[in-house]
Design a protein with these regions (language model features):
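Conserved beta-hairpin
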Residues: 14-24
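Conserved acetyl-CoA pyrophosphate-binding loop and the N-cap/start of the following alpha-helix
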Residues: 48, 52-57
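Conserved acetyl-CoA binding element of GNAT-fold acetyltransferases
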Residues: 36-46
């Protein structure tokens, strides 16, 4: 069983990907202001690479942005690549 948890302290946050109870990936972000976040890092344990976990983390941030009516600046190269390839998420890109 997999799950993604979010932690946010209003200045920065993270989405953490768990497989069973083991942390296998993480995406971090910082708040620019009340309307924008910057995704600054995405990382997945190499043993779990190629399963799409990194993309799932970015898409979880997209869902969060839509619910909060905010925009995302994908500074992290991986997140930028996900945004560049997926036209369906451009609505939240700043």
């Amino acid at each position: 069983m997999t799950r993604i948890e979010q932690k946010d302290n209003s200045k920065k946050g993270r989405f953490i990907y768990y497989e069973e109870d083991k942390k296998v990936g993480e995406m971090t972000y910082v708040w620019v202001d009340d309307y924008k976040i910057i995704i600054d890092h995405t990382e997945v344990d190499p043993a779990y690479g190629g399963k799409g976990y990194g993309k799932e983390l970015v898409l979880k941030a997209v869902d969060f942005a839509r619910k909060q009516d905010i925009k995302i600046i994908p500074l992290c190269p991986f997140a930028k690549k996900v945004f560049d390839k997926d036209l369906g998420i451009q609505d939240v890109k700043f």
